[in-house]
Amino acid sequence: MALRRPPRLRLCARLPDFFLLLLFRGCLIGAVNLKSSNRTPVVQEFESVELSCIITDSQTSDPRIEWKKIQDEQTTYVFFDNKIQGDLAGRAEILGKTSLKIWNVTRRDSALYRCEVVARNDRKEIDEIVIELTVQVKPVTPVCRVPKAVPVGKMATLHCQESEGHPRPHYSWYRNDVPLPTDSRANPRFRNSSFHLNSETGTLVFTAVHKDDSGQYYCIASNDAGSARCEEQEMEVYDLNIGGIIGGVLVVLAVLALITLGICCAYRRGYFINNKQDGESYKNPGKPDGVNYIRTDEEGDFRHKSSFVI
């Protein structure tokens, strides 16, 4: 038979728990504490947003409020000395006692914001809370580059790039309005193709194009704020005319052979030699052979001496 503890003893056993609870509540009283209804707000660019910072417990009627912005490892004041500071001046205000509202947010407002409260009359004088603000920007029309014509078996690279979206968009490619997988081997529908798509850079690479890869291509850039696409561009895959290439090479070789043969025939018939001799046989007729003109110091004029060979 179990022994029952008298009611008075049960009450005494509960007294330590009661005193601990009172002690705990006494520690909380007079300690400033903060909370937020949303620590990770997300907003579209050019909209307004409220950064929630609420005082739940404090014995100080007029605590000091400060807001700071933490971005790129730098900390700057947003609200200090009861004034909006920095790049938020003119487009932000304090709601209630501590919350911060921002109008017309831009992508540069994406950062960590720290709400700090100093209550001099409280047991715990300081408390703070950090809020991460994300400003989303819809992508603009991406720039797409698609080769117009590629021979069968050659490599081809398609590019898609967008620079305005935030967070950075992901890219997807379409051929004839059919979405392409990141790897052609992952889908039996594209078993005749060999390509790989990098959804982060927007690059679509064909290791060796086939005739089935011909078609209309376009790219879509998308993030949580929206999406945008470029205009369709056609890529044609054509067969190489091996017979025509060989025939063209043979024609060129035949023409070169005929030119060489003609030059050799002209040289053998003496066309180049006769022209050279004709040029060397030409002499100046102004001075006949066998006549010497000598001028002496005694004569003022020329004296003619001649020798004749008969």
UniProtKB/Swiss-Prot annotation:
Name the record gives this protein: Junctional adhesion molecule C
All copies of domain Ig-like V-type, residue ranges: 35-127
Disulfide bridge map: C53-C115, C160-C219
Record localization: Cell membrane; Cell junction; Cell junction, Desmosome; Cell junction, Tight junction
GO biological-process terms attached to the record: adaptive immune response; adherens junction assembly; angiogenesis; apical protein localization; cell migration; cell-cell adhesion; cell-matrix adhesion; establishment of cell polarity
Hydrolase is among the record's keywords: no
Annotated domain remarks: The Ig-like V-type domain mediates interaction with JAM2.
Cited InterPro entries: Ig-like_dom, Ig-like_dom_sf, Ig-like_fold, Ig_sub, Ig_sub2, Ig_V-set, JAM-C
